[in-house]
A protein has these predicted regions:
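Buried hydrophobic-core signal for structured, non-transmembrane domains
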Residues: 31-36, 76, 89-95, 131-137, ...
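Surface-exposed loops/turns
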Residues: 25, 68, 85-86, 126, ...
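Extended, hydrophobic interaction surfaces within ordered domains
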Residues: 63-96
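Surface-exposed binding patches on compact interaction domains or structured appendages
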Residues: 2-17, 36-76, 141-212, 216
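Terminal connector regions
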Residues: 83-109, 222-257
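Beta-strand elements of well-folded, non-transmembrane domains
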Residues: 37-39, 52, 80-82, 95-97, ...
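Extracellular/luminal low-complexity segments enriched in Ser/Thr/Pro
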Residues: 76-85, 188-190, 216-226
């Protein structure tokens, strides 16, 4: 089997396409190419050399086996710099005796990283402000604004189990409707207000490949119950930052009190 690479034997293959088109986000450009083995021997097309208008050579991976004189459609995938701006990029490739046009159609790619994505808020005093820092990285190929976020959710992690248990024990014999009524009233009673969110850098532009340290102020609701397990989250583009509230109030141990 003859190996066709960007260095040798590329004259043995051809392509039916007048223009080879690869399309997608910069990290994953895909396109279907119909290769023709113009020789009487089995060949492996490993890769091809693509020539850019900036006089740069780019190796295009292929990886297809062709039997003698076989014609086969093959999906090609190519990765560019992840920060390559959206647009159309024209190149050429030598296939046999013909130089073919290669069109790379780069689409918008939103890719972000947040660190950390889980926080601990130490203290549930009413109206307490927690200040946190989060690193926001733009890993895509378009400009992104730091979003203006107003609030995040907060809820007691045991709200469903506790109120369902109370409803079943208290009014289970009075029928399903009565039980559900007690359950929903308990849920409503235990619901908390939102956590207020403020990001100092809101509105700033983060270029592709850049990162910015965000200063986030989080104000807990004025009314929270002691010794409850509160948790919540807020959305940041397509990701979520989660947080857990820790009550710093010491819990009295009944057994210890008895021993005294």
């Amino acid at each position: 089997m003859i190996k066709v690479t960007h260095k040798e034997h590329h004259e043995r293959i051809g392509s039916k396409e007048d223009v080879i088109i690869l399309s997608g986000p910069p990290s994953s450009l895909n396109g279907l190419v119909t290769f023709h083995n113009e020789s009487d021997e089995k060949i492996l097309v490993r890769d091809l050399m693509v020539h850019t208008h900036k006089n740069q050579d780019v190796v295009l991976p292929v990886g297809v086996i062709l039997q003698p004189r076989e014609v086969k459609a093959h999906l090609i995938t190519y990765s560019m710099d992840p920060h390559t701006p959206p647009g159309r990029y024209e190149m050429t490739v030598q296939l046999g005796k013909t130089r073919k046009k290669v069109l790379m159609v780069v689409h918008e790619s939103m890719h972000i990283q947040l660190s950390p994505r889980k926080m601990v808020l130490n203290g549930i005093e009413g109206g307490q402000v927690h200040e946190k820092e989060v690193l926001f990285s733009n890993m895509g190929n378009i400009d992104l604004f730091v979003p203006s976020i107003r609030h995040g959710t907060i809820q007691d992690r045991d709200i469903t189990c506790r109120n369902l248990g109370l409803a079943l024990r208290t009014d289970a014999e009075e029928g399903v409707e009565k039980t559900l009524d007690v359950f929903t009233r308990g849920i409503k009673k235990d619901l908390s207000d939102f956590v207020k969110i403020s990001i100092k850098e809101a509105g700033e532009v983060v270029k592709p490949g850049q990162a910015i340290l965000l200063h986030i102020a989080m104000t807990v609701p004025k009314v929270l119950k002691k010794n409850y397990n509160y948790e919540g989250e807020f959305s940041f583009y397509y990701k979520a930052i989660r947080y857990q509230l820790i009550d710093k109030t010491p819990v009295e141990n009944p057994q210890r009190q008895k021993s005294k």
